[in-house]
A protein has these predicted regions:
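Membrane-water interface at the C-terminal end of transmembrane alpha helices
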Residues: 122-141
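Mid-chain, well-packed structural core segment of small domains
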Residues: 72-107
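N-terminal signal-anchor transmembrane alpha-helix
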Residues: 6-39
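Interfacial helix-loop-helix junctions of multi-pass membrane proteins
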Residues: 36-46, 95-112
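Individual transmembrane alpha-helices with interfacial aromatic-anchor signatures
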Residues: 109-126
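Loop-to-helix transition at the N-terminal end of transmembrane alpha-helices
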Residues: 37-57, 78
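Short alpha-helical transmembrane interface motifs in multi-pass membrane proteins
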Residues: 15-19, 47-48, 89, 119
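Core segments of alpha-helical transmembrane spans in multipass integral membrane proteins
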Residues: 26-27, 48-68, 84-85, 122-126
Length: 141
């Protein structure tokens, strides 16, 4: 029985970057839906808290759908992909939030302050671990 050919690291990380674009599109749609359907009922702050958990589910579903296609099977590579997604997402959130939405630095930082109810660090942890979690569930790693 022959082993399938190994996917190159360049291919793995290119595919991971493509899937990050899918993740960001999913999160943008999630944010729009939250703003339309949830914010009017529970307010912005509570909506953001709920959104961390619903967004984490969306991220895990996308990771589950694409983890085989990405081609990484070693836990080190899967964690590196998660770290790539984390860095890209943080950069996107800061650049988009600050320069497109006009949010203050204090407003951006508030979502990361667990002591004041900001739960985004939990979502970022899920994002970073999602390739590894998905690979374990799919028995890729």
């Amino acid at each position: 029985m022959t082993q399938p050919p190994q996917t190159s690291r360049a291919t793995i990380f290119t595919r991971a970057a493509v899937i990050w674009l899918v993740l960001i599109c999913g999160e943008i749609l999630h944010g729009i839906a939250r703003g339309i359907f949830l914010v009017p009922h529970v307010g912005e702050f509570r909506s953001n808290q709920i959104g961390v958990f619903t967004g984490s589910i969306i991220i895990l579903i996308i990771a589950l759908a694409f983890v085989r296609w990405i081609g990484a099977s070693h836990p080190r590579d899967l964690l590196a992909i998660g770290f790539l997604w984390l860095i890209l997402t943080l950069a996107f959130e800061i650049l988009f939030g600050r320069f497109v939405m006009g949010a203050s630095w204090e407003r951006l930082a508030a979502d990361y302050n667990i002591a004041r109810g900001g739960l985004l660090p939990i979502g970022m942890l899920v994002l970073m671990l999602s390739p590894l979690i998905a690979a374990k569930i799919r028995r890729v790693a």
